[in-house]
């Protein structure tokens, strides 16, 4: 059993952020493959968000110490907890350091010593190594992904000269650049561009989010809609838009990856994102990178993306082949050393006699069936070594005959 432990001080609520979507999608893919998996929450009881994920098994614990009693492979999500587990534990670090420390009672710096750490991007691995001041050279990266719903959703047809549609789907916190976005609307380069801006209320369950939400509701240029609770509904929302903006700040927060960017491109949208953190790693053909915390640069990026229009069918297809849930879970199983990964990576074919592995055998009087005649196992690994050995033996035989 692979148990994902939600270590956040907030419940596991759908639509609140990428960490929830990332984790739920991986659990679903594991279950689809027949690998037991579940979500564990601590201290919330059954009010932990499970109603948003009816297809995922949940286990509610009263305290972190109960984790020590489980015979599971523990994968902490957000940050590790200071618990001695029965088996090697892992932690997927979804946020940059040291943001966990602020008002989170479960956070302990010492908890990072035991579990094996996994990051969501190459950028994240770098900043965590520097923060922890330890050699984590083998810290693996397990990239997030876009649910298949995003690549499959149909984009509705719109009147040819209708205003472009721009979407901000990040959480309503300053980290995500919502204030930069508001400031960008004041620049002349956008005032003459016909477009409509939609913002979801994701993250409005926090104090900061509720304040921002009230402000947005009074803005004449912004339409506020409910955050979508599942991939299918989110995909439909994105498909109605041409551009998705991700103006994440670089001052007091750094985006480790950016799932929304991947999902948007799979849905056929252009993305305007800050050249910050792990966001550049999300560019699969449809991203315009702009200077972070710069409203004027953001306005120019939005204008450029609107002029380019949504991705073409060909561009969307190419983008959708990258960052899939299958690839993400393959990487996860590899990082966990799970036997399912080992089995799935075993060779499923053998090279036939006379293939390109054996072209040199004919030069030494050996037939194309030489490997079979020599009783060799035809696996990709053994074939090369045995064929090379046979060739060397044949050369020695020829050389010996020449001397005689």
Predicted regions span which residues?
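A conserved mid-protein helix/loop that constitutes part of the nucleotide-sugar donor-binding site
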Residues: 21-25, 173-187
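A short, active-site helix/loop in glycosyltransferases that binds the activated sugar's phosphate group
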Residues: 101-103, 113-138, 146-150
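Nucleotide-sugar-dependent
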Residues: 248-261, 280-281
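Glycosyltransferase donor-sugar binding loop
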Residues: 43-45, 196-210, 227
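A charged, aromatic-enriched C-terminal amphipathic alpha-helix characteristic of glycosyltransferases
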Residues: 18, 60, 307-365
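Nucleotide-activated donor-binding/catalytic signature segment of Leloir-type glycosyltransferases, i.e.
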Residues: 209-232
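Short hydrophobic beta-strand element within catalytic cores of glycosyltransferases
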Residues: 266-273
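Conserved acidic donor-binding segment of nucleotide-sugar-dependent glycosyltransferases
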Residues: 285-295, 303-310
